[in-house]
């Protein structure tokens, strides 16, 4: 599996969560190109490839039901069929959808981290590169601050949601040591690859903090995609796979409480 547990801190890590940033046209061009390749390899209609193998449905603000009969989705597909330039049509359709710019249902935000209620007894973690001084939010010099963000977040969870909870996450960022060091080991130990082509935890790796495309990463991805002859292997074209993780909230209470009692930044000497 490409890129798992990679060291170092990539430049301009972007959001693992959806945010209100306006994404660049190149981000949509990339997904269209991927969908066209999927359609060729699989024999699927392009409409189905766009629904199942891109983030467009969510980016258009249509939720996560992925209903092929949704009126807005059908409007998009109708325009796509008639468009002289499918890339231009797709981006203009995105820009005129006000719901597409809306942030998810975040409960609370602490620095670069936030959380949302998932289902029942679950909360979901989100990360956004919120530092604005040009430094990486996941750099070693920010380790103490990121741990403080998470300690504050889980203090809020403990105070406002006293029932037993499961903490869940899904992101390409869990491949990176710079991100993994922020979380308890039992949580990381559950990491497993999930193949979900519809969601930002996969596609977000191609974006910087400003919503612009990472050109070098994108170029390498497209070169690998061009060489594929089977649908089974298209997921391997992505630089990083999405890892899903889950653990009891008590693991987080224990981990961040212990870090606060140790040296600054949660590191023992």
What is the predicted function of each stretch?
Residues 1-138, 156-168, 177-269:
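Non-catalytic substrate-recognition and accessory regions of acyl/acetyltransferase enzymes
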């Amino acid at each position: 599996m490409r890129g798992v547990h990679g060291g170092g801190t990539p430049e301009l890590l972007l959001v693992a969560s959806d945010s209100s940033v306006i994404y660049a046209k190149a981000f949509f061009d990339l997904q269209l190109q991927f969908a066209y390749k999927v359609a060729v390899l699989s024999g699927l209609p392009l409409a189905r490839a766009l629904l199942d193998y891109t983030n467009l449905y969510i980016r258009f603000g249509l939720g996560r039901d992925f209903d092929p009969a949704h009126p807005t989705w059908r409007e998009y597909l109708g325009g796509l069929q008639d468009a002289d330039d499918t890339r231009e049509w797709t981006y203009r359709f995105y820009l005129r959808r006000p719901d597409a710019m809306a942030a998810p249902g975040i409960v609370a935000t602490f620095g670069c981290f936030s959380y949302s209620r998932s289902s029942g007894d679950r909360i979901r973690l989100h990360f956004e590169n919120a530092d604005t001084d040009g430094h990486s939010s996941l750099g070693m010099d920010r380790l103490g601050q990121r741990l403080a963000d998470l300690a504050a977040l889980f203090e809020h969870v403990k105070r406002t949601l006293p029932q037993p909870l499961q903490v869940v996450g899904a992101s390409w960022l869990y491949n990176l040591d710079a991100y993994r060091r922020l979380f308890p080991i039992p949580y990381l130990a559950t990491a497993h690859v999930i193949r979900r082509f519809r969601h930002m935890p996969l596609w977000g790796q191609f974006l910087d903090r400003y919503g612009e495309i990472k050109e070098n990463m994108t170029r390498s991805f497209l070169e690998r995609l061009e060489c594929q002859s089977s649908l089974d292997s298209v997921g391997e074209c992505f630089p990083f796979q999405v890892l899903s993780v889950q653990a009891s909230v008590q693991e987080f209470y224990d981990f961040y409480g212990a870090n606060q009692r140790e040296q600054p930044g949660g590191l023992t000497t």
